[in-house]
Amino acid sequence: MNTFFKLTALAGLFAITGHAFAVDDITRVDQIPVLKEETQHATVSERVTSRFTRSHYRQFDLDQAFSAKIFDRYLNLLDYSHNVLLASDVEQFAKRKSEVGDELRSGKLDLFYDLYNLSQKRRFERYQYALKVLERPMDFTGTDTFNLDRSKAPWPKDGAELNALWDGKVKYDELSLKLTGKDEKEIRDTLTRRYKFAIRRLAQTNSEDVFSLAMTAFAHEIDPHTNYLSPRNTEQFNTEMSLSLEGIGAVLQMDDDYTVINSMVAGGPASKSKAISVGDRIVGVGQTGQNMVDVIGWRLDDVVALIKGPKGSKVRLEILPAGKGTKTRIVTLTRERIRLEDRAVKMSVKTVGKEKVGVLDIPGFYVG
């Protein structure tokens, strides 16, 4: 069911004492990487395809009809809201949808990479357009409507129709912030940061992102509970299943271009140091005997990979404390094996009338 929202009336540079942190804006489409399949992906594709076609409990033929279904799923994973690609883009690639099965068997995934690269280009164009729309005077006096769910809608037939969709999206974003009490300047500043951040994320995509999405489309078309796990996702899955990891015991999240401490595991290295607080930002990571690496603007999973390491090894963090006008400091932590107790089963006994009832709280499933 489509959802409509009725519109009615109603920094690249962050300066801190002693330091200046800057993340360059992406202003040209040639700054977005053209992604290509890596050597190992061909082998993995061949093996995954062989395993799925021979051993999956759901028997299927990887024929032209099934290939078309994988293509459609992949296309919708790339552009779920049908507001990035044009109808002509979709038509151009749809001519090749019957080739999907052959590409998966051979490991030569040209269609997946070509379509992904085009979607990256189109997404860059959309956010650049949105930034220009922000320069217009804001007007909430009309009775416009904005469709929040376009997953079943046709792709726009031309640039004018696509621009009209994004005019509505920007106005919806503006009004959403207006309803929180922000003034016009605050709204523009917030959305400018948001759209530029989205553009910078485009420049951080890599070949593994494309391959994982292609394999996910394949797996989910066979069965919604079948998944492909990339090496990094496999590591995360193993952590969740064992409820343990080797690191500093901190939960991180992104806030604009900063990696922020969201919470800390009690008894972990970060918590025990007393030198790190929730809300602090990690702006640099250094290994023993190596220079500090500036991680402002990095993908969160890349920052996490840099911080994690073997038990007993040391990691240096350049911490920018929460708040404005603060200076960075270096905190050295020794990595430990962290037990994720908050995700383990908890038991309690409740008194109900004259009876006692045992209650198990199961946050998730794990081994051991």
Residue map of PLM features:
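Boundary at the C-terminal end of the N-terminal hydrophobic targeting segment
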Residues: 20-22, 189, 205
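N-terminal-proximal low-complexity accessory segments that begin disordered
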Residues: 37-79, 89
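Cleft-lining beta-strand/loop regions that shape enzyme active-site pockets
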Residues: 36-37, 53-62, 200-207, 223-245, ...
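Acidic/histidine-rich, surface-exposed loop or edge segments in extracytoplasmic proteins
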Residues: 24-34, 45-57, 95-99, 193-197
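PDZ/PDZ-like domain segments forming the peptide/carboxylate-binding groove
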Residues: 76-77, 98, 112-128, 138-172, ...
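Active-site-surrounding "flap" and adjacent substrate/cofactor-binding loops of secreted or lumenal enzymes
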Residues: 79-106
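Gram-negative bacterial Sec-dependent N-terminal signal peptides
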Residues: 1-21
